[in-house]
């Protein structure tokens, strides 16, 4: 998720309870292909605690996908994910991301180029996955998902809405179940992951049971509980005890938020706008007296230091 799943927030989530695999923010192939001349794209920054980490890329040039895949393959990442699902209109109208649903020939070229490039110099093959939606204006499950499954990808992640729906209306899990049926007939070795309206590990497990898919990708659900991946797991070294976020005290929630502010400031050093931090305050400031007031105060701050002063001056319950 753009300006959400950066290296800083992944570190926060990892200390609360890591998922099985992280994905980066989606990164333009033009930026990846410019490495090392222009340095590593900020969206690909990472630390060891965030691994395994898959790089999600997007664009329309097969040649740049090929070059990007070769670069990623030698940087220690766990895989390459091609974004064919972002519904943002200005991106879609340029034929990128979900716009590729209407351009299957180009989508096939992109996948082939990425697979060709996803081999490290020591001969290791990186998995190549595609994240997509069930259509643009209407579902075209058999035509589109069946087509993708025939391209030799390792994983297909299906968001059960059309591009025009964006996040509106319920996620159609029946279409994901149909994707599993298509997989069984077309590409039995390809994994199918479900995406959309999954807010907890339990919901992810239920969707897997309902659809027959192999896994679940959680996106916006992390906004309701940074600890959601820890549920049902035993604590691991360096991780917090396995309690849901709703069980944390006000002081614990504010301490985690304060750590996030410090990390964001120190990592990006002004290269990302402070305003980005404000979308995270709603995660932490819930479920205790004064949470709404503090959230309102922080939403009116103008930089990191201003936010930290407001927190220091606020009487947070114990």
Segments predicted by a language model, with ranges:
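Active-site beta-loop-alpha junctions enriched in small/polar residues
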Residues: 1, 27-29, 58-60, 85-87, ...
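Glycine-rich, positively charged N-terminal anion/phosphate-binding segment
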Residues: 1-74
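Alpha/beta catalytic cores of nucleotide-metabolism and tRNA/nucleoside-modifying enzymes
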Residues: 2, 8, 112, 116-117, ...
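Alpha/beta enzyme core
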Residues: 11, 15-16, 66-80, 84-94, ...
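Glycine-rich, aromatic-flanked loop segments that form ligand/cofactor-binding clefts
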Residues: 19-36, 98-103, 107, 122, ...
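Hydrophobic faces of well-ordered beta-strands that scaffold small-molecule active sites
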Residues: 22-24, 53-57, 80, 128-132, ...
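Short, charged, surface-exposed secondary-structure boundary motifs
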Residues: 32-34, 166, 225-231
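Short glycine-enriched, charge-decorated loop/helix-capping segments at active-site entrances
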Residues: 39, 95-101, 165
